[in-house]
Every structure is written in C-alpha cells, then in structure tokens.
Amino acid sequence: MTSIDILVIGHLERGADGSVVPSGTWSTSSLVRTDDGHNIVVDTSQGYMGAGIRSSFKQIGRIFPEDVDTVVLTHGHPDHIGNLGLFRNAEVLKFSGGDPMDGVTLLDTEKEIAKGVRFVRTPGHTEDSGSLFVDADRRYGPSAGESGEEGGPRLELRSR
C-alpha cells in the first residue's frame, strides 16, 4: 500500500507584533513510499532541520535517506531545499523557472514518477511551483509543501 509519512512539519504562528513567524520550520517535508518500491521525498525543509529528518527516518524504520529514489521540490526557495545532501542517491526534480540549481533535473511538463504518483506544475507564489499527486487508499493532494496559513501544513485529503 502506498503510504505518506511527514518527516518534518512546517507551522506558522502569529507573533506578538502580529507578524507570521515559523514555529520550527517554514515548510513541511514528506516521504511517499509506493507499492512498487519507490521512495519519494517532497521538499527537504530548511538546512537546520536535517537532524529532524534523520530522526523521522529512524522512527519510520527500515528506510534510510540513501534509499530515496526521487526528491521533488515544490519550488526552489531555501526553506524547501536545505537538506538535499541527505538524499545523495536521489534524482532531484523541479519545474523550470526560478533560480538555476546544480544537480536538479528541470521539468517543463508533468511527470509520472511511479504508478499513481504524478508531479504537476501548479500555480504558486513562484514560477517553478509544482505539486505531487498521489493515488492511495485515500487521495492525497496537492502537496504544495508550504505551511500555508496559520495552523499548519496544507494537505488536502479527498476521498475517491
């Protein structure tokens, strides 16, 4: 069965002065494990969250960052790309646009990464925004990777 695990959760809170500030990190990082053995990470969070990501892999068990086949970046901002070095065996995908990045495969059209897993260009706050759509027992999508509004990550669950 395809599964989705949250590695680190991006969360925003309202500061005393009314500004929006991260609580921990700005962006969420997730692990998708498919029926056919693909391991996909969506965003790698900010660099200082590396220990949290490694800890999540230990809690999940039987999988390590080196086992990840593909990393998809919902866009190229620093809070989404900070731990790419953890996934040294993975192909890294991002949609074209934004700043160029070494070692990243740029896409112009959607890509099926594994059966039932598609990376699709979607509107966002950057020209290179994309979302991962996953067909599972429940439909998960889109995974924009942003903390979104106050209150936590945006993950829309829709039943089939």
What are these regions (language model features)?
Residues 40-42, 72, 139-143:
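Residue-level marker for buried hydrophobic side chains located in beta-strands
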Residues 32, 43, 68, 75, ...:
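Divalent metal-coordination and catalytic microenvironments
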Residues 1-38:
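Zn-dependent metallo-beta-lactamase
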